[in-house]
């Protein structure tokens, strides 16, 4: 029941994929228990993603990490009319994927951008057309120095910029 509730309430899983996952979970239990799983969890102020490719994105990122290669992808944001807009005029990003992290119900890929010489993060549900590169990953020495808990606390849900103390 907890797994069904988690799937239904998770915003990074589309409605269609939620139904498919729950149907698979129902096959693992008796008919009586399956009927109990057919319920709706009410979650307020929650929009589910429309990006059906999130599962493939996660697989491609993990393949890049395990294959020790960079990945290429397009990245988008939503404009004020709630329309998808590709960033960088649709140009592909090339990043060395380091790790996937889940924060505040969003999956993030943390990776090294060799061009900017920075560790950056990208929401996985806003990544499109992910492909593995032939180039080896870079930035491992930067990642070894990274305190993931501190990075997540300072970065996720925030805009990038210099950290400044305010009096």
Write out the residue ranges for each language-model feature.
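Bulky hydrophobic/aromatic content
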Residues: 2-82
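Structured loops at beta-to-helix junctions and adjacent beta-edge loops in soluble globular domains
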Residues: 74-76, 103, 112, 125
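Surface-exposed, charged, gly/pro-rich loop-and-adjacent secondary-structure segments at domain edges
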Residues: 109-167
């Amino acid at each position: 029941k907890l797994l069904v509730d988690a799937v239904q309430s998770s915003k990074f899983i589309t409605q269609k994929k939620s139904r498919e996952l729950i149907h698979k979970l129902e096959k693992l239990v008796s008919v009586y228990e399956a009927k109990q799983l057919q319920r709706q969890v009410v979650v307020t102020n929650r929009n589910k993603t429309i990006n059906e490719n999130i599962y493939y994105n996660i697989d491609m990122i993990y393949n890049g990490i395990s294959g020790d290669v960079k990945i290429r992808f397009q990245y988008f944001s939503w404009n004020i009319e709630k329309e998808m807009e590709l960033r960088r005029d649709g140009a592909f990003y090339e990043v060395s994927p380091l790790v996937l992290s889940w924060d505040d119900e969003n999956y993030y890929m943390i990776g090294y951008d060799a061009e900017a010489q920075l560790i950056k993060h990208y929401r996985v549900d806003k990544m499109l057309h992910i492909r593995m590169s032939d180039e080896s990953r870079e930035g491992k020495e930067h990642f070894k120095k990274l305190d993931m808990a501190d990075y997540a606390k300072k970065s996720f849900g925030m805009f990038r910029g210099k950290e400044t103390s305010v009096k």
